[in-house]
């Protein structure tokens, strides 16, 4: 029979004699092996996880969720008397509107409420509501039996308008904006100084400017500056795109603008940023077809909210556009937009600063001549310089390197600035600004 294993793979009796006996691991060796690969806090973390599992098990046992098919607590835990008392004390209310207050200064005032599509009633207040909480025109909650006023309700605002409010501040700061030093100073005078030092304006007897128009070619940092302002102030920030206010049905856009400012007045201080305002703020004209009538109604409502019969309050308004020549003169007048800030192309110092800002978060070699790169990018916007830095990183990735070199930046300048010049609309937009 042929030996398929071979002599080198087959054990002999002499080899078996030389083999050492296999010793079983004791408990100490097993405990030592278990500690391999564990961090300093592994034991504490495991202990906390076990405690959490025990608490969850105890909670489920008390509520009886696992034992019940319906997910209800077991009947032994029911409190029917307390549930009935809760139902009697907390009954569903009907929404109405208080249209007038009769004998408001007396001890027993009466309130005229209007229940929509039903009737009008003269009612009293319940014991839980103070007379100072109710005002004329306010939405209130009334019971279905005596129609007494139980709670005051906040104003009705469209959920689409409420969702425009930004809860988290943008992560852009003034140090992330390059080539706009003068523009940032003008913005801070209008937005930050009235909020932080209002006594300066009171002593002089003037009202601070409340509206700013940011205009300039695309990519010069208008929206970036607005995000930096929102990061610096503690005011509520509401960004609005102009095209969001262009609605299909008549009156919808004007209603959204009205509710937007109504929500802003409820805040202590508010900053509203209208981006691409030329979508609704164009000059009025009659084309004969009436296609732009709804857009013009939206703009008229915006004009009224900016400087109309009702005071604007502590609301700052920023607007950004690439085409200031198309805006309506009524929107541009002082009192509505007090300050116009032009964002022009950055100079040599600004372009160098923009290169350093974008290279700050990149892995680049030392001693890159950013001023030389800035000289090779004349008449370039901040967005184009950012594209140069991104392309330099792509060249480094293509060459399988971990850092970007100056040669990568030079090749990126040739690709973005020189090759893409035919796609640039900056010269055409410079004639509009």
Curated annotation (Swiss-Prot):
State any single GO MF term: proteasome-activating activity
Source domain of life is Eukaryota
Q: Modified after translation how?
A: Monoubiquitinated by RNF181.
GO CC: one term?
P-body
Query: Which residue ranges are recorded for the region named Disordered?
Result: 1-22
Family annotation (SMART domains):
AAA
Single GO BP term: ubiquitin-dependent protein catabolic process
Query: What InterPro entries does the annotation carry?
Result: 26S_Proteasome_ATPase (IPR050221), AAA+_ATPase (IPR003593), AAA_lid_3 (IPR041569), ATPase_AAA_core (IPR003959), ATPase_AAA_CS (IPR003960), NA-bd_OB-fold (IPR012340), P-loop_NTPase (IPR027417), PRS7-like_OB (IPR048723)
Task: List residues modified as N6-acetyllysine.
Answer: 116, 422
Task: Tell me the keywords, alphabetical order.
Answer: Acetylation, ATP-binding, Cytoplasm, Nucleotide-binding, Phosphoprotein, Proteasome, Ubl conjugation
Basic and acidic residues bias: where? 8-22
Q: What does this protein do?
A: Component of the 26S proteasome, a multiprotein complex involved in the ATP-dependent degradation of ubiquitinated proteins. This complex plays a key role in the maintenance of protein homeostasis by removing misfolded or damaged proteins, which could impair cellular functions, and by removing proteins whose functions are no longer required. Therefore, the proteasome participates in numerous cellular processes, including cell cycle progression, apoptosis, or DNA damage repair.
Q: How does it assemble?
A: Component of the 19S proteasome regulatory particle complex. The 26S proteasome consists of a 20S core particle (CP) and two 19S regulatory subunits (RP). The regulatory particle is made of a lid composed of 9 subunits, a base containing 6 ATPases including PSMC2 and few additional components. Interacts with NDC80 and SQSTM1. Interacts with PAAF1. Interacts with TRIM5.
Membership in a protein family: Belongs to the AAA ATPase family.
What this protein is called in its record is: 26S proteasome regulatory subunit 7
- Give the organism the record lists: Rattus norvegicus
């Amino acid at each position: 029979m042929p030996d398929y294993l071979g002599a080198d793979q087959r054990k002999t009796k002499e080899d078996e004699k030389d083999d050492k006996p296999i010793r079983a691991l004791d408990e100490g060796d097993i405990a030592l092996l278990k500690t391999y690969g564990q961090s300093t806090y592994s034991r504490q973390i495991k202990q906390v996880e076990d405690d959490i599992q025990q608490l969850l098990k105890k909670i489920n046992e008390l509520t009886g969720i696992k034992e019940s098919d319906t997910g209800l607590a077991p009947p032994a835990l029911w409190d029917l008397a307390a549930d009935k008392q809760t139902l009697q004390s907390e009954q569903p209310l009907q929404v109405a509107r208080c249209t007038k207050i009769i004998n408001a200064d007396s001890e027993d005032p009466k309130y005229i409420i209007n229940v929509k599509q039903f009737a009008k009633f003269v009612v009293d207040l319940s014991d839980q509501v103070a007379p100072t909480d109710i005002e004329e025109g306010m939405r209130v909650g009334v019971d279905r039996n005596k129609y007494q006023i139980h709670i005051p309700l906040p104003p009705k605002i469209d959920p689409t308008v409420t969702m425009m409010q930004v809860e988290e501040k943008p992560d852009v700061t003034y140090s992330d904006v390059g080539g706009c030093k003068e523009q940032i100073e003008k913005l801070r005078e209008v937005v930050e100084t009235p909020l932080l030092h209002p006594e300066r304006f009171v002593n002089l007897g003037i009202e601070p400017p409340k509206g700013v128009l940011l205009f300039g070619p695309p990519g010069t940092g208008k929206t970036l500056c607005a995000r930096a302002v929102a990061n610096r102030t503690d005011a509520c920030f509401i960004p609005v795109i102009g095209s969001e206010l262009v609605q299909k049905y008549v009156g919808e856009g004007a209603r959204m603008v009205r509710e937007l400012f109504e929500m802003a007045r409820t805040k202590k201080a508010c900053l509203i940023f209208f981006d691409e305002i030329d979508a609704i703020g164009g000059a009025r004209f009659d084309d004969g077809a009436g296609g732009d009538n709804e857009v013009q109604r939206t703009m008229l409502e915006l004009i009224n909210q900016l400087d109309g019969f009702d005071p604007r309050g502590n609301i700052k308004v920023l607007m950004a556009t690439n085409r200031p020549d198309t805006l309506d003169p009524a929107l541009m007048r002082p009192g509505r937009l007090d300050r116009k800030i032009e964002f022009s192309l950055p100079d040599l110092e600004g372009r160098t600063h923009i290169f350093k800002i974008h290279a700050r978060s990149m892995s680049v070699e030392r001693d890159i001549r950013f001023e030389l790169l800035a000289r090779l990018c004349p008449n370039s916007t901040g967005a184009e310089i950012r594209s140069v830095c991104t392309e330099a990183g792509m060249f480094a990735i293509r060459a399988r390197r971990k850092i970007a070199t100056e040669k990568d930046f030079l090749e990126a300048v040739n690709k973005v600035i020189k090759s893409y010049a035919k796609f640039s609309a900056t010269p055409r937009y410079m004639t509009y600004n």
